[in-house]
């Protein structure tokens, strides 16, 4: 492991750095230990250089720290016998630095990056399931966790730090992974967390309102997503042509694969493409007939709703662009399983059908309700809330969407965090034409229970917002709570 030596590690940036052996690469001084390399970056909330004395006291072997300007780039000092190397623009270089430290793990597998507001988790899971069915050892990285397929370990962020990402990829390679599908968040792109990764392919799902508390406006949010295609090493590019932003990007990416279920192909398009020619929705999912640059076929999907047809087609186009055979993909497609907490259906005889979904944006809630309606013979119920300390502007929008598309609406708490639940609910209700038609039940388990107990056998109850999550954030507490387990207990089935 030649690059676990400070001199070798820094060779591209610093001549004759001190030669010392390194154990692990650490960003958090609190977990630094003897032999580690502590990297002191200037973050959004804290200046890591303030914690250099603590890291030294804990026995680190060396430190790489943000330099004060380009003039100090490459400067080497010593503090209490520990070498400190200063690099300018350290945040931008961190992905490359971590890549060298962990022996460039992304070069040793097929790495697929999936970005977009909604559909990232399902698309990455479909890519991993599908490729594994065709012989790969597949892994996922994202919202529901990182790890080999079926063995993902839960994570806090969709895209971890630049060091976390390279470390996880290194672990996956050690475990035998040959294929990894990674969710790439807008935060991760803006903060350079995947800057040095070579993506075999990159997928764009869609763009709608989310994270405006961070990005400020939709233009900045779109620009963040565009970074994956404009400034990263990407082989194949797969773009959803049914999205307004995607259609615009396709005009700038002539070699990208256009994917559509609405026949949104540019007339005279010379690039590669895949389109649905017929979609039949039924109780168990959908039958999807398609045509493409690689040929025609038909897939039986077990996933609910139109947006999952889009996710399926994006995954299919990605694998076709990488050379996987069409006939084998079609056969394996019927075996793909729905994703935990993503339009996950719970059935019990004599009870309403309940669907648990992660939808927590206006667009996602709209699509989830439209999907549930396709499979509903009776009334459509919607139980949802909005998270605290996040974009307040989407709350009335989501209230209006629920009122318009559902027959019965129950507004409840999501993750209120430090906000008053009553204030969040008031924001939601402000978007309704007739707030009197809506039930407000703050306790989430009570709200879910009430909706299911009131609903009839033919009805569908959509429980939206938390999906796979097994906790609720109230104040500074992290409480044990799961929509999936609550629903399963009420219906007498296994979650």
Swiss-Prot record:
Domain of life: Bacteria
Major subcellular location class: cytoplasm
Residues that bind ATP: 116-122
Name of the protein: UDP-N-acetylmuramoyl-L-alanyl-D-glutamate--2,6-diaminopimelate ligase
Annotated pathway: Cell wall biogenesis; peptidoglycan biosynthesis
Keywords attached to this entry: ATP-binding, Cell cycle, Cell division, Cell shape, Cell wall biogenesis/degradation, Cytoplasm, Ligase, Magnesium, Nucleotide-binding, Peptidoglycan synthesis
GO terms of molecular function: ATP binding; magnesium ion binding; UDP-N-acetylmuramoylalanyl-D-glutamate-2,6-diaminopimelate ligase activity
HAMAP family assigned: MurE
Protein family: Belongs to the MurCDEF family. MurE subfamily.
GO BP annotations, alphabetical order: cell division; cell wall organization; peptidoglycan biosynthetic process; regulation of cell shape
Posttranslational modification: Carboxylation is probably crucial for Mg(2+) binding and, consequently, for the gamma-phosphate positioning of ATP.
């Amino acid at each position: 492991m030649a690059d676990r030596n400070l001199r070798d590690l820094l060779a591209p940036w610093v001549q004759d750095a001190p030669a010392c052996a390194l154990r692990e690469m650490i960003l958090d001084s609190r977990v630094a230990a003897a032999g580690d390399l502590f990297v002191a970056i200037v973050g959004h909330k804290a200046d890591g250089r303030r914690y250099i004395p603590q890291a030294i006291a804990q026995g680190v072997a060396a430190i790489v720290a943000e330099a004060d300007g380009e003039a100090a780039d490459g400067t080497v000092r010593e503090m209490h016998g520990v070498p400190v190397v200063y690099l300018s623009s350290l945040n931008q270089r961190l992905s490359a630095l971590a890549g060298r430290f962990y022996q460039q793990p992304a070069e040793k597998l097929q790495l697929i990056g999936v970005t977009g507001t909604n559909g990232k988790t399902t698309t990455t899971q479909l890519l991993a399931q599908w490729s594994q069915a065709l012989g790969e050892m597949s892994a996922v990285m994202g919202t529901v966790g990182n790890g080999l397929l079926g063995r993902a370990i839960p994570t806090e962020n969709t895209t971890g730090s630049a060091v976390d990402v390279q470390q996880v990829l290194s672990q996956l390679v050690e475990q035998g992974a040959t294929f990894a599908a990674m969710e790439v968040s807008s935060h991760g792109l803006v903060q350079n967390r995947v800057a040095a990764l070579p993506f075999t392919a990159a997928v764009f799902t869609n763009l709608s309102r989310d994270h405006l508390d961070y990005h400020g406006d939709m233009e900045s949010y779109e620009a963040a997503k565009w970074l994956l295609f404009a400034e990263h090493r990407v082989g194949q590019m797969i773009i959803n042509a049914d999205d307004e932003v995607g259609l615009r990007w396709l005009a700038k990416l002539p070699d990208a694969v256009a994917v559509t279920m609405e026949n949104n192909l540019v007339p005279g398009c010379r690039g590669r493409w895949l389109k649905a020619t017929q979609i039949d929705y039924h109780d168990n999912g959908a039958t999807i007939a398609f045509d493409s640059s690689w040929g025609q076929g038909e897939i039986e999907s077990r996933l609910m709703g139109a947006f999952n047809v889009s996710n399926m087609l994006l995954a299919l186009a990605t694998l076709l662009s990488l050379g996987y055979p069409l006939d084998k993909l079609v056969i394996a497609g019927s075996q793909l399983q729905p994703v935990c907490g993503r339009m996950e259906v719970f059935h019990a005889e004599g009870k309403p059908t309940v669907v648990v979904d992660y939808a927590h944006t206006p667009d996602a809630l709209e699509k989830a309700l439209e999907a549930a309606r396709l499979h509903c013979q009776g009334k459509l119920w919607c139980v949802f809330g909005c998270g605290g300390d996040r974009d307040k502007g989407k709350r009335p929008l989501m209230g209006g969407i629920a009122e318009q598309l559902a027959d019965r609406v129950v507004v409840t708490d999501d993750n209120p965090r430090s906000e008053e639940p009553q204030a969040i609910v008031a924001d939601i209700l402000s978007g309704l034409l007739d707030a009197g038609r809506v039930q407000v039940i703050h306790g989430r388990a009570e709200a879910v229970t009430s909706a299911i107990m009131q609903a009839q056998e033919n009805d569908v109850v959509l429980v939206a917002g938390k999906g796979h999550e097994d906790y609720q954030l109230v104040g500074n507490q992290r409480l044990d709570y799961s929509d999936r387990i609550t629903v399963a207990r009420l219906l007498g089935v296994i979650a």
